[in-house]
């Protein structure tokens, strides 16, 4: 006795999945996350296997190559990371001697971060490899599709930032307290 065949999924016209999602893998955030997981795994392998740094640490290295002498809080803001994760990555990069920390004159609590010569060498060796992976990924698209994607990503980033700042109806996270916020009764 054979089991009945599963009911066919309602078909969605290609190019319409985002506007009319039928399943989790039709949702924009899910699809972007999967793309990052798959394509990003190559960057992780390059970073960790080739240079002994995490992808997050690579983000800090790239930012400090572009903006040397940046305070950790500004680095966190520009990378969209929380301060604790940034602090852990900074501590790791300091121990690997890829970045240096210099106290500000007049206020030793304030500091700026810069790449060391070793950190700059890692950046200069790794960046062309990451750019090549980026180009390989984009090679699957026509030039006009790449341009449209670039424009769409720019607009979506602006929209997401606007939503985060204006959507006060969405509950805040309280991860340090174990999840959802519960008002004291």
Region annotations inferred by a language model:
Residues 1-51, 177-185:
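N-terminal leader segment of winged-helix/HTH proteins
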Residues 36, 62-66, 127:
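Short, locally clustered residues in the helix-turn-helix/winged-helix DNA-binding domain
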């Amino acid at each position: 006795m054979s089991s009945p065949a599963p009911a066919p999924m309602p078909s969605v016209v290609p190019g319409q999945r985002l506007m009319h999602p039928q399943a989790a893998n039709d949702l924009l955030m899910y699809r972007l996350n999967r793309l990052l997981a798959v394509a990003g795994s190559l960057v992780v392998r390059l970073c960790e296997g080739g240079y002994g740094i995490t992808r997050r640490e690579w983000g800090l290295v790239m930012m400090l190559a572009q903006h040397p002498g940046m305070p950790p809080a500004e680095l966190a803001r520009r990378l969209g990371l929380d301060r604790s994760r940034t602090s852990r990555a900074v501590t790791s990069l300091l121990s690997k001697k890829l970045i240096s920390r210099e106290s500000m004159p007049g206020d030793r609590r304030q500091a700026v971060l810069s790449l060391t010569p070793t950190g700059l060498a890692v950046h200069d060796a790794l960046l062309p490899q990451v750019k090549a992976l980026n180009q390989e990924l984009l090679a699957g698209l026509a030039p006009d599709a790449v341009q449209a994607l670039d424009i769409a990503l720019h607009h979506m980033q602006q929209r997401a930032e606007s939503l985060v700042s204006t959507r006060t109806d969405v509950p805040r996270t309280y991860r340090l307290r174990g999840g959802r916020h519960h008002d004291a009764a």
